[in-house]
């Protein structure tokens, strides 16, 4: 008997680099480890992340947007199998990728990644330190220090 079309969508693709769906999902989950890609998603596709464009913070329920529900379900599906060793072995940066997928399971994180200070905190301290640390708690200060350090490095390199 042939499998139902819905059943096939629920099963992860076989972990082979020759399977197109596997390589597509591998590329997508790998890109989620990049905080700037998360920012791109938040800015360009806020409806997928349950971000209210009107800026009304009181409306935190994304149940009204079927796109946000579908994307959250897709992220949960991806996390459910990419965290297994059979699939995680193909990730270039498994720690950062799986942490990003885990964080994206949270509604509040999906809504907060539109804020530049959240992205800078992730980029400056790494996703592995999202639970605390001075830079994550005060991202404006960390960003200023980082920019100053970059400018000093550029000045120093142009003098030599």
From Swiss-Prot:
GO terms for cellular component: mediator complex. Residues 124-160 are annotated as: Disordered. InterPro entries: Med31_sf, Mediator_Med31. Keywords: Activator, Nucleus, Transcription, Transcription regulation. The keyword Heme does not apply. GO terms for molecular function: transcription coregulator activity. Disulfide bonds: none annotated. Pfam families: Med31 (PF05669). Its main location: nucleus. It is found in: Nucleus. GO terms for biological process: regulation of DNA-templated transcription. Coiled coil: none annotated. Residues 147-160 have a biased composition (Polar residues). Component of the Mediator complex, a coactivator involved in the regulated transcription of nearly all RNA polymerase II-dependent genes. Mediator functions as a bridge to convey information from gene-specific regulatory proteins to the basal RNA polymerase II transcription machinery. Mediator is recruited to promoters by direct interactions with regulatory proteins and serves as a scaffold for the assembly of a functional preinitiation complex with RNA polymerase II and the general transcription factors. Belongs to the Mediator complex subunit 31 family. Component of the Mediator complex. This is Mediator of RNA polymerase II transcription subunit 31. It comes from Aspergillus terreus (strain NIH 2624 / FGSC A1156).
